[in-house]
Amino acid sequence: MTHIKRKATELHPAARMYARECREGKLNRREFMTRATALGVAAPAAYGLLGLAAPEAKAQTPQMGGTLRIQMDIKAQRDPRTWDWSELANVCRGWLEYLVSYERDGSVQPVLLESWQANDDATVYTLNVRPGVTWNNGDAFTAEHVAHNIERWCDASVEGNSMAGRMSSISEDGKLRDGAIEIVDDLTLRLHLSSPDIAIIVNMTDYPAAVVHPSFTGDDPVANPIGTGPYLPVSHDTGIGAVIERNPDHTWWNEGNGAYLDRIEFVDLGTDPAAWMAAAEGGEVDMTYQTTGDFVDLFEMIGMPATEAITAATLAVRFNQDNAPYDNVNVRRALQMAVDNQLVLELGYNDRGTVAENHHVCPIHPEYADIGATPFDPAEARAMIEAEGLGDHEFELISIDDDWQAATCDSVAAQIRAAGINIRRTILPGATFWNDWLNYPFSSTEWNMRPLGVQVLNLAYRSGVAWNEAGFANAEFDALLDQANGIPDADERREVMAQIQQIMLDEGVLIQPYWRSLYRNARPNVLNAEMHPTFEVRYLEYALS
């Protein structure tokens, strides 16, 4: 494979194509920023391609010091590459950093990488490591350490390692492919992909991609907190809370541009928003992790304004095809047809989002294809269930006891029941639900947004991947997804995505009622804490005024 060396100041040729597509309305601005910056184009240059100036930083100057108290669930920690909830990552962001980050404007920004470049066909990526970064044990951060982490991510033998599915273009037989990484020098390495992969850099922004020290053995990152960031954990109690404090013995590489707070306290108040509200009124918390339903407005009424992020986050009410009767496509499609997604959005999520179409690709994704939705036909749904000999069968829909998720599943079940199909609801406490979320026969799972449509399909529905809670396996789907992963042009990729989305509908993989707008409430003196579209709690950037 020929590697085309490109100066850091040169623009990748695909970036101009994306800019043209954005001007023509084929990509929105956030989609354009994701695509262009993922190829190594700096954010100011990407804005310049659209004839725009990069947004300026806010005028308020953060002050040093203070304690910030954040409402958030605290879950038992484990190897970052096996993290399956954002909250696990958020606790550790103070010392475990990332190679790159996904921003609210859709851009991908360098963190522990200083920059990167892709060759013209996106088969070779040159990664330039940020100079001057040290671990908090004094070791210098090098290209060898980046390579070590990428190799860890590729190891599919580790149960629950979702990163393995994201690294398929540099993997073979469940591990890093020989020759996939070339270490050029202490601060430079190259990735040699087996095929073009438009998502590989963007995948490194996802929360399981936290960068760990080579001495990390895969256990609890809180117990042995070696990292590059400016904070250290003081305590971590599952279901209760966690405390993080600035590390006085470590010089952070980004000194002066963050780490304003002295102390961050995460407070676990359970899943009932009324308890969060009471804690806020009692002066016990300063901001929420996320706020839903009527509580967005209720928090505002007590002086905690909300910020909003328009996202492709969702609730997947999925069937696990490894369990009867959900191994029957006619059963799955019948249950889909019994549900009006618009009504679920209104009743389950207070109409704070947009209607989805049961294929887990969002209109804000650049490759989204408008193929129509599953028809709402309760009578046909009942007839199909009877035709399968299940007229007297009682289905069971399981959800966590979280307010909005329970309300959504209540709405789904009520419509199935109204169609003349027997169904019962089971609501489980968080600690019980999370332990087995992958395996329930019929349940709902909260899914974060990913910037590209192919990302979530690779994570959730490719045959055999760690997070395939639907038990979905389809060779044609996998082959089309491989094809889509390598197509940079949004229009061309959309043609393939139309086929992929149609397979999702034909196979009745899930009931996906809506796309979520996300909200966070915080006291007015909390700076830089706007809701992030992928639920990141970036306390390195937060400050108090």
Model-identified regions with their sequence ranges:
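Gly/Pro-rich hinge or "lid" segments in bacterial periplasmic/extracellular proteins
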Residues: 103-107, 196-265, 274, 378-379, ...
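Long beta-strand-rich cores associated with HINT superfamily self-processing modules
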Residues: 520-545
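Ligand-site clamp/hinge motif
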Residues: 216-222, 250-298, 413, 422
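N-terminal secretory signal peptides
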Residues: 1-31
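Surface-exposed binding/hinge segments that line
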Residues: 163-214, 237
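N-terminal lobe/hinge region of extracytoplasmic solute-binding protein
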Residues: 71-120, 151, 226
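Structural transition elements
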Residues: 231, 352-387, 403-407
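Extracytoplasmic/peripheral linker and loop segments enriched in polar/acidic and small residues
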Residues: 182, 404, 424-433, 456-524, ...
